[in-house]
Amino acid sequence: MKVLSNPRFLAVYSAVLTVVFTVVVLCAAAGLRNQTFGIITARRINIVEPDGTVRLTISNRADFPGAWNRKKEYPRPDRREAAGMLFMSEEGTEQGGFIWGASQLPDGTIENHSHLSFDQYEENQVFAIDAGQEGKDKFSRISMVDQGDFPIEEKRKGNEGIDKLPVNEQDAAWERFFATHRHDVKRLALGRSPDGSVGLELRDQSGKVRIVLAVRSNGEPILQFLDEDGKVMNRPK
């Protein structure tokens, strides 16, 4: 028993255990590095870089993430309406996403939606594809947008401050904000409207519609060229 209580023996015993434990852990880690699975069931999966930076999130509706900016996640309760995916840059900032959902309400009304978008660097979406249905109304569209050249973090901070203002002061506050921060401008819209018409709208850099190509729900074709005041310059018969 004296041998077991000898300090030298205890030191050697401790060292041996440490080595054995380290070998076991390393071998286990090596074995886990490359694994093959048939089916994985999860509520949310984060794909990360070796340094922990999240690059892709696949999530259900309940656990859908907020907005990511510079490796920090900000709450977005409004995003808990669909399952989907979020794409993040090497810097941990949101770069786009894909969400979807469909359900039938107790009264039989159908709600169906899907959205795929890609973002400008440190900004909001510049290209998006949407499709959906609300009751009997169906739509689908492709959109292209010019975004401002300021970091979206500035808009987030501005939004936090403006939300604290009285409701009757918020519109004026946003006008002051966008006086120094260029607002997003829709440049192209291609889609099908709920009334069954299809069309293409092309806009100038200020967001004014300049060309319209469409087929109305009654089958009538439309081709319009508009000036900067919205006046039709010519309309082929």
Describe the function of each predicted region:
Residues 1-34:
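Single-pass membrane-anchoring alpha-helices
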Residues 25, 30-237:
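Parallel beta-helix/beta-solenoid repeats that form elongated, surface-exposed shafts/blades used
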